[in-house]
Amino acid sequence: MEHDGTAALGWAARDASGHLSPFSFTRRVQEEDDVTIKVLYCGICHTDLHTIKNEWGNAMYPVVPGHEIVGVVAGVGAGVTRFKAGDTVGVGYFVDSCRACDSCGKGDENYCPTMVITSNGTDYGGATTQGGFSDVMVVRQDYVLRVPASLPPDGAAPLLCAGVTVYSPMVEYGLNAPGKHLGVVGLGGLGHLGVKFGKAFGMKVTVISSSPAKREEALERLGADAFLSSRDGEGMAAAAATMDGIIDTVSAGHPLVPLLSLLKPKGQMVVVGAPAAPLQLPAIAIIDGGKRVAGSGGGSVAECQAMLDFAGEHGIAADVEVVAMGDVNAALGRLERNDVRYRFVIDVAGTLHAAAAPS
């Protein structure tokens, strides 16, 4: 590596329009425990959309988004022992943590209060982090993940965020027991992976959606055992107290009480979708039946590696539409309209430099 860092090319947003265009910048110098990664594919997450449009008020322009990254190791520092050149690896939502707080001590780096996120974060040297809509990453080896050879690299990319977001709470809260009944609310990028993991765990899986048109998709394409329209009052009543657990992946505002009615006594609902408006939760809805509601955000390094290994063993990959970097703005527009089944993934290595070339 050059003494002054590694030249990088990405696509960045410069303002709240969210429009992306080519952006040249410099990655930090590869240190002793760093892995330099040639980016192959990067998924597009709703978080990227929120960030580049400054919908959360924290954008530090220019912003290179992307935190669902699969690539190949191009170089390693002298102290790196876990990876070598040519390995297929992944990088998820964060690239560093303090390693000193209570959460880090417990292996829950994803809850570290000073966690360094992969894009639009601030590293411990004060620099703004730039994400995977770029040709190269430099990441500490402790935050790099090994991607099983059995997984397609494009379909593996969304597992680094969407995959671990559903896998982690399923394992943490015991919603992975064979023979148990799992409800998956929503059939988007998160929900379709919840179905796949649930079936691989040996569970009975029911998809719950406000869109009856998704019935065939849930049952025929994804292999869910049942489909329940949340708009079907009779169907919801018939399914009351039948589910051991529910993963709620919906990011639009929606009532929780009808979903809680589906749980058996002492059932567990885990919320991983994040609606902008507060969710309404009357106390009696959880007191009656001793039901529990929890939240979950992403997953730790160990959980993410376990998820990738499990996915590799069971052939679980995201259903993706691969797009060229030159089409990324159109893809972001479609994502905003929920016009994707189920995740967009950018072919970074194959299209980034061509898209940036003068026409």
UniProtKB/Swiss-Prot annotation:
Gene Ontology BP annotations: lignin biosynthetic process
Pfam families: ADH_N, ADH_zinc_N
Name of the featured protein: Probable cinnamyl alcohol dehydrogenase 8A
Purpose: Involved in lignin biosynthesis. Catalyzes the final step specific for the production of lignin monomers. Catalyzes the NADPH-dependent reduction of coniferaldehyde, 5-hydroxyconiferaldehyde, sinapaldehyde, 4-coumaraldehyde and caffeyl aldehyde to their respective alcohols.
Binding site for Zn(2+) 1: 45, 67-68, 161
Residues where Zn(2+) 2 binds: 98, 101, 104, 112
Assigned EC number: 1.1.1.195
Cofactor note: Binds 2 Zn(2+) ions per subunit.
SUPFAM superfamilies for this protein: GroES-like (SSF50129), NAD(P)-binding Rossmann-fold domains (SSF51735)
Single annotated GO MF: cinnamyl-alcohol dehydrogenase activity
Keyword NADP: yes
Involved pathway(s): Aromatic compound metabolism; phenylpropanoid biosynthesis
Family from the record: Belongs to the zinc-containing alcohol dehydrogenase family.
Subunit-level organization: Homodimer.
UniProt xrefs under InterPro entries: ADH-like_C, ADH-like_N, ADH_Zn_CS, CAD-like, GroES-like_sf, NAD(P)-bd_dom_sf, PKS_ER
Source organism phylogeny: Eukaryota, Viridiplantae, Streptophyta, Embryophyta, Tracheophyta
Broad EC category: oxidoreductase
Residues where NADP(+) binds: 47, 165, 186-191, 209-214, 249, 273, 296-298
Catalyzed reactions per annotation: (E)-cinnamyl alcohol + NADP(+) = (E)-cinnamaldehyde + NADPH + H(+); (E)-coniferol + NADP(+) = (E)-coniferaldehyde + NADPH + H(+); (E)-sinapyl alcohol + NADP(+) = (E)-sinapaldehyde + NADPH + H(+); (E)-4-coumaroyl alcohol + NADP(+) = (E)-4-coumaraldehyde + NADPH + H(+)
Cofactor(s) in the UniProt record: Zn(2+)
Domain of life: Eukaryota
The entry's keywords: Lignin biosynthesis, Metal-binding, NADP, Oxidoreductase, Zinc
